[in-house]
Amino acid sequence: MTSVRKRKMNRSSVKKVSRRNKDKQKKKLIACNPIIAKNWDYSLTLAQNYEKLGLKAKLQTPAGGQEAKYDTVIKKEATIDPVTQFGEDSDSDSEEDSSNSQEDNEGQNVEDIDENEIPEGEARIIRDAEGNVVKVVYGKKKVFDIDDDIDTIKAKLADQQKEETEVVKQLEAFASRPIVKKERVQSPREVEWLEKLYKKHGDNYKAMFFDRKLNIYQQSEGEIKRKMRKWKSENNIA
C-alpha cells in the first residue's frame, strides 16, 4: 500500500524530473570562432581536431598519453640476424662485419667533419678502430646571430617551422584584420549629472569631488575631469 504522498505524486500532472533519458553525448556547438566552427569535426576529440586544424591543444610539451598514429609505419631493424642466428656461418659473418666497421672507422678523417656545420652547443666524437676517443669537434654554427635584424630571425624561424594549414592561415588573416575602436558614449543621465556639476561648481573639480549630494558615487577628481572634458567638447564649451 502506497503512502499518501506517493498517491498525490501519481495523481499530479507535473512530470517527474529525470535525467535518465538525457543524452550524455550531447553535441557541443563551437561558437568561439567562425573559422574553427566551420572546420570542426564533431566525430573527433578535441586533441584530434586541434591536430587536424594545425593548432596545439597544450602549449607545453606533452608528458605522455598521446594517441598512437597507426598510419605511419615504423621499421625496426633486428639486432640479431634471424637467418644466421643458429647457422654455422654466424661467426664468420660477425668477423666480416667487425672488420668492415673497423675499416670505416679507420677511414674516417678528422678533416671531413666541418665544425662550422655543427650547431653551437653540440659536438662530434671521433674514435679510432678500438673505440678510443681521438678528438672531439665542437660546433661553431650559430642558430641566431646577435647582429641580425628581427625580420631576419623571424624568417629563419618560419623556415624551420612546418608548413601551416589553410585554417591557420585563415585565423592569422582574421586576427590581423583592422579593428575600429568604438568610443564610449555618455548616457543621458551622465550628461545631466555633468551639467548639474558644471552649473554649480564651474571648473572647480575639487569642489565637485567633495560635493556629497551630486557626487554620490564618490568618483575621483581625475575621473570627473576626464568626463567633464568630453562633455565640454561635445557641447562646444571652452
Swiss-Prot record:
| Localisation per UniProt entry | Nucleus, Nucleolus
Record's compositionally biased regions (Acidic residues): 88-120
InterPro entries to which the protein is assigned, alphabetical? Ribosome_biogenesis_Nop16 (IPR019002)
- What are the GO cellular component annotations? nucleolus; preribosome, large subunit precursor
The reply to whether NAD figures as a keyword in the UniProt entry is: no
Q: Which Pfam families does this one have? A: Nop16
Q: Where is this region: Disordered?
A: 1-26, 80-122
Q: Which domain of life is it from?
A: Eukaryota
Q: Does the keyword Nucleus apply?
A: yes
The protein's UniProt keywords, in alphabetical order, are: Nucleus, Ribonucleoprotein, Ribosome biogenesis, rRNA processing
Major localization listed first in the record, in broad terms: nucleus
Q: Could you mention a single GO BP entry for this protein?
A: rRNA processing
The protein's role, per its UniProt record: Involved in the biogenesis of the 60S ribosomal subunit.
Which PANTHER family does the record associate with it?
Answer: HSPC111 PROTEIN-RELATED, NUCLEOLAR PROTEIN 16
Question: Which family does this protein fall into?
Answer: Belongs to the NOP16 family.
Subunit relationships: Component of the pre-66S ribosomal particle.
Q: How is this protein named in the record? A: Nucleolar protein 16
What species was this sequence derived from?
Candida glabrata (strain ATCC 2001 / BCRC 20586 / JCM 3761 / NBRC 0622 / NRRL Y-65 / CBS 138)
